[in-house]
Amino acid sequence: MDNANCVGGCKFETRSFQYRRRIPYSLGADPLPPVHPLSLKNLVDIDTDLISSQLYELYDSIILNDSGLERRYAFVQKLEQILKKEFPYKNIKTSLFGSTQSLLASNASDIDLCIITDPPQCAPTTCEVSAAFARNGLKKVVCISTAKVPIVKVWDSELQLSCDCNINKTISTLNTRLMRSYVLCDPRVRPLIVMIKYWAKRRCLNDAAEGGTLTSYTISCMVINFLQKRDPPILPSLQMLPHLQDSSTMTDGLDVSFFDDPDLVHGFGDKNEESLGILFVEFFRFFGYLFDYEHFVLSIRHGTFLSKRAKGWQFQLNNFLCVEEPFHTSRNLANTADEITMKGIQLEFRRVFRLLAYNCNVDDACSQFTFPSLTDTSFMDDYVNELQLEIVPGFSHGRDSSDTSCTESPPEPSHFAWAFDPYNATASPYYNQNINSSIDYSSIYSNDVPAIPPNVPYTFVDPYTYACYINNNSYLPPSYMDFYTWYNSPYPKSSHHFDERHGGDRHEKNLSNSRRYSRNKFHKKKQSSGPFQYYPDAFSFTPTDNNSPPSNSSSSEVVSPVSLHSEPVLSTVQAFKS
């Protein structure tokens, strides 16, 4: 039996929470249609100075003050004295972690406490700790021993504070140190994370245990990765900077080292002059409309995005949003939210962006969400209908009808070139770049492009896969069906559809697999038979020769709206016939 918990036979171990799913199942799991960035309101048309002033005013009113900090330390000392009295031979110490130590706590935040014993094997169980707290007059004692991290929840009626205690989970204190170091790197980090956490709490989106949403730590990691990906970046990756690595930096077999001198990193983001209001608005624009949830993982350890396929997370449960734990890199912090919940959260991101873009009112954006009574079944239906309005980026609701700065149709394509590179998603989606007007680009922007009949061979390059190829010379998709997809096709883009269109013949798919193995040199031995014979350079794609498809395939030219290099371009590339 695990020393940290005791399942069964404990009167404090109870399902005290009434599970209240935050996002209704009736919202459905259908993917949101893509939204052209040019259909969103431009940043220059948003009063970000007004938003900044509102954010700072609200931040000053909710941030943890000195008196609140003193009450927290008094509560921790009280708990430690109780534990030492109840377990005198356990060598118990306590360590604060979480938002209080990382400087991200508000006056309404809970206390997170780690109970440390020496040696760890002599630790009391969560049920024993719960009983000890109850015997000493603490209220609302709850033992949750079956969670991934068993905890004891307790409330002090005198100090009006609640605390979550775990036992010997010291890696949580290291996560707090890392978060605190990031907060001290730039003065904009702390208010931005605090205000986004405040929004999430007001909208009931930061309760993974009860509502099936996200944790506050996951949201903080999303903000840090967002700041690492700004252009120029505001935060570095502290784990990638040179620092001491030895046996002392290993905990439970994990490398928990990082560059922990924020004074030397202070000023890293000075070249980025974006205000708090701009960052607040752009955070919701990015995660509401621009981030590629299907293919990428947020990693603050690497300070960038990682491929789900490269990490092997494309088949994990609840992997719509993937946030890599900075130390335990095989763990997805966001797996507490399923696909329907993440669809609802993405629509909540869009709701905030709409209110900020057209009303510039932070109070409206952070309005309190209140769960209805169990008998009120119409409330959640109305809420789902409200969320579904965010799917269409027309923003006809909640703004002045005379405002024509943003329409459902993007600007005239002859004056703009849109290029979105998922590996460098920080650049503004607005490029005032003249492009060749002699080419008809209307099919890129039109919302009513007729479906391409199955017998027409023209295809469109998938931007994600093409960007992977351009940025990595060794990259080759698992099959050419991933590389070239039907643009605006009513048919599913899957290998099953591929086989059906070829009469169930898998010969061409096997050819694609053989090309992949050849390109990556997985099979060194020459194939003596079969539809494909091994030649090392038979399909040598290089970025300098991106107009040369494999010699045994016919091709046709299409327009690819992707960024090939540092400059956004809209160029013709070769595509295979399907």
Curated annotation (Swiss-Prot):
Compositional bias annotation for Basic and acidic residues: 496-510
Gene3D superfamilies named among the record's database cross-references: 1.10.1410.10, Beta Polymerase, domain 2 (3.30.460.10)
Known catalytic reactions: RNA(n) + ATP = RNA(n)-3'-adenine ribonucleotide + diphosphate
Biased composition (Basic residues): 516-527
Low complexity biased stretches: 547-565
Gene Ontology terms describing biological process: 3'-UTR-mediated mRNA stabilization; mRNA processing; RNA 3'-end processing
Binding site for Mg(2+): 110, 112
Subunit structure: Interacts with pab1.
Protein known as: Poly(A) RNA polymerase cid13
